[in-house]
Amino acid sequence: MKVTLIAILTCAAVLVLHTTAAEELEAESQLMEVGMPDTELAAVDEERLFECSVSCEIGKEGNKDCKKKKCKGGWKCKFNMCVKV
């Protein structure tokens, strides 16, 4: 009886692990298909850095601290400009 129970639980655990691994692989493959090439990502990062820097400078006018202007999308305000986190 114990052996049967152990075998059933082992099979269930293997099935769960296999299903989880398969889902992760499927998600990775979809990201690779939909994802942008590295050069396009770099261009987006440069544009975001420029936009955030300008936003921080605008927010700094009138003795306002740059940190009051919140940067979005994985960026934070540092050294009077937004930087990628």
Curated annotation (Swiss-Prot):
Localization in the cell = Secreted
The cross-references to Pfam families, in alphabetical order and at most eight, read:
Toxin_20
Provide the disulphide bond pattern: C52-C66, C56-C77, C71-C82
Write out the propeptide range(s).
23-48
Gene Ontology cellular-component terms for this entry are: extracellular region; host cell postsynaptic membrane
Q: Which PROSITE patterns match?
A: HWTX_2
SUPFAM superfamilies listed in its UniProt record: omega toxin-like
Show which residues constitute the signal peptide. Answer: 1-22
Give tissue specificity per the record: Expressed by the venom gland.
Q: Which family does it belong to?
A: Belongs to the neurotoxin 12 (Hwtx-2) family. 02 (Hwtx-2) subfamily.
Instruction: Briefly state the protein's biological role.
Output: Postsynaptic neurotoxin.
Q: What is this protein called?
A: U4-theraphotoxin-Hhn1j
Please report the organism this UniProt entry assigns to the protein.
Answer: Cyriopagopus hainanus (Chinese bird spider)
